[in-house]
Amino acid sequence: MSTDEPKTDAQWRAELSPEQYRILREQGTERAFTGEYWDHHANGEYRCAACGAPLFSSSAKFDSGTGWPSFYEALNAQAVRERTDTTHGMVRTEALCSRCNSHLGHVFPDGPPPTGLRYCINSASLSFHPKD
């Protein structure tokens, strides 16, 4: 199968852990303060756990006090796409991997300078790659 063809649900289920599948493919959310990266401070790059696309730099990570990894900007303008999420009786901005369309988390307008944004991302949506 070409890398340009979308994966089937069965392929995603085979490749992802049940928790990753629930979050990445079913728009789930992990409980606060339980994910691997909420208190992670190493220098490197955070990538999509589903497809490996580079998403965030550790230099943009900050402690938001929310219990989820938080970033004030994506790695670049093409890394993360946004769409309106009206689930759970709220209107929010969902963050998705631009490459594979997997759910990452949400974007809120309460972050620090220079952007004022807070990308609130599920740890299960990420893999970390240390800087060499």
UniProtKB/Swiss-Prot annotation:
Zn(2+) binds at residues 48, 51, 97, 100. Its EC number is 1.8.4.12. Binds 1 zinc ion per subunit. The zinc ion is important for the structural integrity of the protein. Its cofactor is Zn(2+). Keywords: Metal-binding, Oxidoreductase, Zinc. InterPro entries: Met_Sox_Rdtase_MsrB (IPR028427), Met_Sox_Rdtase_MsrB_dom (IPR002579), Mss4-like_sf (IPR011057). The active site is at residue 120. One of its GO terms (cellular component) is cytoplasm. Pfam families: SelR. Residues 9-131 form the MsrB domain. One of its GO terms (molecular function) is peptide-methionine (R)-S-oxide reductase activity. Transmembrane segments: none annotated. The keyword Zinc applies. It catalyses: L-methionyl-[protein] + [thioredoxin]-disulfide + H2O = L-methionyl-(R)-S-oxide-[protein] + [thioredoxin]-dithiol. One of its GO terms (biological process) is protein repair. It comes from the Bacteria. Belongs to the MsrB Met sulfoxide reductase family. HAMAP family: MsrB. This is Peptide methionine sulfoxide reductase MsrB. It comes from Thiobacillus denitrificans (strain ATCC 25259 / T1).
